[in-house]
């Protein structure tokens, strides 16, 4: 990941968190290298435009979006949930089923 993409990723994630504060999910956009024919995730795996995949460790759904030469990865994940007097229990499976839920 080059410096431009790293900065844009951090900015996009921070902006999404500010906008979506208090909601049950977050979303972010990670722009790919200009002229790229594939989306490349943090693990180096390549995806074609339209591909959807899951990061079960982070409980996120990701999608390679756009046309070649202007591709981006759009990610969605769980928000922060806190209910006083309850514990938080992580779900199972892919996003959104893996999102934590209060257990009272």
Swiss-Prot record:
Does the keyword Nucleus feature in the UniProt annotation?
no
GO cellular component term, pick one: extracellular region
Alphabetical UniProt keywords: Disulfide bond, Secreted, Signal
The entry's localization annotation reads: Secreted
Residues annotated as signal peptide: 1-25
- Which branch of life, at top level? Eukaryota
* Summary of the tissues where the protein is detected: Expressed by the venom gland.
Cystine bridges: none
Modification comment: Contains 4 disulfide bonds.
Q: Which InterPro entries match?
A: SVWC_dom (IPR029277)
Is Metal-binding given among the entry's keywords?
Answer: no
Per its record, how is this protein called by name?
A: Toxin-like protein 14
């Amino acid at each position: 990941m080059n410096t431009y993409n790293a900065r844009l990723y951090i900015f996009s994630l921070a902006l999404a968190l500010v906008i979506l504060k208090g909601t049950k999910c977050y979303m972010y956009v990670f722009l790919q290298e200009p002229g790229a024919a594939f989306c490349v995730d943090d693990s180096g795996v390549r995806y074609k435009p339209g591909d959807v995949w899951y990061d079960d460790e982070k409980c996120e759904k990701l999608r390679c979006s756009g046309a070649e030469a202007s591709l981006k990865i759009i990610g969605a994940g769980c928000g922060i949930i806190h209910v006083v007097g309850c514990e938080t229990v992580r779900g199972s499976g892919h996003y959104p089923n893996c999102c934590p839920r209060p257990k009272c």
